[in-house]
Every structure is written in C-alpha cells, then in structure tokens.
Amino acid sequence: MKVIKTLSIINFFIFVTFNIKNESKYSNTFINNAYNMSIRRSMAESKPPTGTGGSGSAGSGAGASAGNGANPGADAERSPSTPATPATPATTTTTTTTNDAEASTSTSSENPNHKNAETNPKGKGEVQKPNQANKETQNNSNVQQDSQTKSNVPPTQDADTKSPTAQPEQAENSAPTAEQTESPELQSAPENKGTGQHGHMHGSRNNHPQNTSDSQKECTDGNKENCGAATSLLNNSSNIASINKFVVLISATLVLSFAIFI
C-alpha cells in the first residue's frame, strides 16, 4: 500500500510538472508566432510603393538646382527689361551702319574741295578754281566709293523684304496640312471606340472584386511562412487543450486513488 501511495504521488508530481512545461512551451510559441505575424504585417504596411515618383522628383530637383547654380549670370541677363532681338533686324542695322559710315566718308572726302574754295583771300573777289588733277582724283575716289557701297550692300535686305510676303504663303500652305492631319484622326475615331469598348469589357470581366480573407491573400501571395504560422497557431492551441484535458483526467484518477487507498 505504501508503495502504491508513493508511486501515485510521484506520478502526480511528474504529470503536474509536465503539464506546466508544456503549457509554458506552447504559450511561448503561441506568443512568439503572434508577435512575428504582427511584425510582418506592420512591415508589409510600412513598405513604401516603389515607383518613379521619388526618382522623378529627385531628378527634377537636381536639374533645377544645377541649372540655377551653374549659370547665375545667364539667369541674371535674362531680365524682362532687355528682350532678345531677332536675327533679321540685326542684319538690317549692320547694313545701315555701313552705309552711314560710307556716306560720311564720301562727304568728308568732298569737304576739302569746299575748304579749298573757302580759303581764297576775301579781298579778292575771285575764287580759286581747283586743278584738273584734283577733279580727276575726286571723281575717281567718288566712283570707288560708289562701287564700294554697291559691293558692301548685303543681299540679305532683299531677302528680308521678301520674307514677310513669304511667311503668309507658308502659313497658307500649313493650313491644308493641318486639315489633312485632322481628317485621319476623325476617320480613326470609330476604330478607337470599338477597341476601347473591347478593352473595357475584358477589364470589367477580369477586375471583379474577390471576396478573400487576409489568410487566403497571404497564402496566394506566396507568403508560406505566414500560412504556416497561422496553421501552427491553431495546432498549438488544439494540442494545449487536449493536453490539459489529459492532465485533468489523470489528476482526477490520482485523487480518487488516494481517497480510496487511504
């Protein structure tokens, strides 16, 4: 009898300790799995969407800063008070300046004749006539100056004077091309409508909302670890319940055995 009592007591303590160990073990695994799942979900939600937004903003900011920092002088020169002049007026101004310079040279070359005429003595009423050699040299210089003025006149003036008339013609020629470009778009409009409807129908078929739970989404996404964690949690809870029932039954039998044999 004493041997049975001692054995029953030993068995009781063994099962109690085993139950405590199992409960602590499974509870720890349950807590760890739940904690890991919460961490994974928080990491999945906190992941930023990978796209071209960040790179585009970085590139545009770098380009703007590089442009403003590399050429501050060019930005300062582009003020509204000094508008940029077109190319054709610049050519006309250069031609006028050359003509004015040549005209001034011609007048300055002719002035010595007048000075020679004015340098006559006032007491005498006669005017000294210039020599024939002076006349010939003056005529030759005038002819050379006229030839220089003719040779220095660029042909751009004629092109500039004709260019305003050519621009309306080009505008008129561009108008039919615009009409031609509009007409194919109008012709291709029904085809685009048909293809758009077709694509819309396929999109409506494929884009129906699917009623799936979070666990199914995680399993379909390929997160096998999450699926395994969820199933392991369920298995652990069921194992804990079964072990608790088994320990309760054994403890009850031991209590009854003590009561009977004592």
From Swiss-Prot:
Residues 237-262 form a propeptide. It comes from Plasmodium falciparum (isolate Camp / Malaysia). Residues 44-223 are annotated as: Disordered. It is found in: Cell membrane. The N-terminal region appears to be involved in lipid binding. It is a lipid-anchor; GPI-anchor. It comes from the Eukaryota. A lipid is attached at N236 (GPI-anchor amidated asparagine). Pfam families: MSA_2 (PF00985). Residues 112-127 have a biased composition (Basic and acidic residues). Residues 1-20 form the signal peptide. This is Merozoite surface protein 2. Its main location: membrane.
